[in-house]
Amino acid sequence: MKKTMLAFLVLLNTIGFAQKIKPVLPVPTKEHLAWHEKEFYLFIHFGPNTFTDKEWGDGKEDPTTFAPTQLDCNQWVRVAKLAGAKGIILTAKHHDGFSLWPSKYSAHTVRESKWLEGKGDVVRMLSDACKKGGLEMGVYISPWDRNHPDYGTPKYNDIYIATMKELLTGYGKFFELWWDGANGEGPNGKKQEYTFRRFEDSAFAYQPHLMIFSDIGPSIRWCGNERGIIGNTNWNLLDTAGFYRGHGGPPEDTLNQGNVNGKLWIPAEADVSIRPGWFYHAKEDNKVKSPNTLFNLFLKSVGNGGNLLLNVPPDRRGLFHETDSASLVGFAALREKAFKTNLFTGLKPLVKTTAGLPTLTYTFKKATKLNAVVLQELIEHGQRVKTFTIEAKESTTGNFVKIFDGTTIGRKKIATFDPITTSSIKITITDAKAEVLLKPSAAHDFGFEVKN
């Protein structure tokens, strides 16, 4: 009984006793907690592929191919802020090996282009724009390099670490370092044996609070697909023993759902592009995802407890295309409309327990229309909830009928259902690892159709 009461004291925002709560391991670090709060940020794929109309360059492209005419990182930041994104991750070096900064460890960089007479630095420009605009920045640095002559030799691992050091010590604080799982051949036909443990140790030495993304972390995991969808069941926990990055990584369903008893806190990030491709292609100008499609992806990623990394590739001018920008602004407007009003505001739930599991009943002052309930755990003490249900009271019979069957909650669960009008909502936790610690719940009427 004491544990149950403690749980509900936390639920009702009286958190003075939280330090006495026994955690359910593993628990997130403070860096994880800050990352979880970001929810949504942009990915930017930009480089020679933008101008060659390719997705994967071969490293043989002439550096002068990179020739943006109006590059404006401040425009990227302005649009990102209008979209409600909390940061931007830039492909500083993709698989072609072309560096968007004048790296001294490569001869395939913006320095060798004619853009700004070889004196340009996209990473610097974006870093400055993000600082000015109040956004955080991250970098994608591809380990695979199809241009570097030392790729496929032990020396290349040292070069890669030196390359990371250039970026991680020369451009300010980054919130995330992104590692792609691709590992193909270099210009000499050789594949590289990456020393990822050294890479990790070096990156953390340069920026101790950095979050590192890859198939298996160490900080953040891939969600197992590039469709922007995280599993309805989503544990922030993962077992990585016996798995590798790229080929040899965990199966898709494991990446998508995590491990219920995983030993490490490695939450899922959903990456998806606003267009069919990752780089800009003019032929895709009429295939940009609509605001409604983006909103549904938000529900399937952030709404399942992960983060959404949405790719928006600049065009050959070096600007976000007008169609992409309009869709992003429309996406933000839908989120604002959907979550603006919390229908539970001012209501105190009636709390009952059965076998230590809570039921929360919210009673409205009058019949109320809604189509979503938002639940959140206090994940700093571990992820606990395994299953839950949501019921609504019928006006004719007075009985409660089930409107949602859920599994995990984690950092956030946005449970959506067909619009209903009811006088009362009942939330029941039906299974959990330990005492349930929830933040105050929310209910919403989006005011538009949601496709589940």
Predicted regions and their residues:
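Extracellular Ig-like/FN3 beta-sandwich strand-entry sites
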Residues: 422-424
